[in-house]
Curated annotation (Swiss-Prot):
GO terms for biological process: fatty acid biosynthetic process; negative regulation of DNA-templated transcription; negative regulation of fatty acid biosynthetic process. InterPro entries: DeoR_HTH (IPR001034), HotDog_dom_sf (IPR029069), Transcription_factor_FapR (IPR017275), WH-like_DNA-bd_sf (IPR036388), WH_DNA-bd_sf (IPR036390). Belongs to the FapR family. The keyword Metal-binding does not apply. This is Transcription factor FapR. Residues 102-168 form the MaoC-like domain. One of its GO terms (molecular function) is DNA-binding transcription factor activity. Transmembrane segments: none annotated. Transcriptional factor involved in regulation of membrane lipid biosynthesis by repressing genes involved in fatty acid and phospholipid metabolism. Coiled coil: none annotated. The keyword Chaperone does not apply. It comes from the Bacteria.
Length: 198
């Protein structure tokens, strides 16, 4: 049985409050209505679109955790970060990110998402990419969502922090990279358990 508009909107607010990352498509499926109906409901309730909700959550949650660059300079939207350990961002590939003829994403967008996430995960005032080894695994098309996952995996003998970034569309790996990061505080901290790498 379909819910009344008032009941659906109440449940919509509750659902978005519990999970601000839910998409309009997922909401439409959950409430058995069209995506357009969900968008109209959101407009009536003054609930911003997913991208704006993600930015709002990121600003509230991560502003004090990301030191190496302003959040608005990160390519993609950070949805989770543990400084000097791991981070996750999402990047929705739109028409402006792809080649017109093939609708395949330009590689520099995937690299920029991964590289800026590698910088953001470094908990220091200054973090720069000293070296990057990257691999494009498969093409990404317009309309796909890329989820990049960064993990600090160790340090080089010269003291650079090593960050591995893997990017996925769904469960499929589309990009991988290993970034050696220079940081302004390159001395090994006491109790740092990261292993050294070559």
């Amino acid at each position: 049985m379909r819910k009344s508009k008032r009941e659906r909107q109440r449940l919509l607010q509750e659902t978005i409050r519990e999970n601000p990352f839910v998409t309009d498509e997922e909401l439409a499926e959950k409430f058995s209505v069209s995506v357009q109906t969900i968008r109209l409901d959101r407009l009536e309730l003054s609930i911003p679109e997913l991208r704006e909700r993600i930015k709002h959550v990121a600003r509230q949650s991560f502003a004090d955790k990301v030191r190496a660059l302003p959040l608005e300079e990160v390519i993609g939207d950070i949805i989770d970060i543990e400084p000097d350990a791991s981070a996750i961002s999402i990047f929705d590939v739109k028409e402006e990110h792809v080649f017109r003829r093939t609708r395949i994403a330009r590689g520099h967008h995937l690299f920029a998402q991964a590289n800026s996430l590698a910088v953001a995960v470094i908990h220091d005032e200054l973090a720069l990419t000293a070296k990057a080894t990257i691999r494009f695994v498969r093409q990404v098309k317009a309309g796909e969502r890329v989820v990049a996952k960064a993990k600090v995996t160790g340090k080089t003998k010269s003291g650079r922090t090593v960050v591995d970034v893997n990017s996925y569309v769904g469960q499929e790996l589309v990009f991988s990279g290993t970034f050696e990061m220079y940081r302004s505080n390159m001395e090994k901290k006491d109790g740092d358990s990261n292993e050294y790498r070559d």
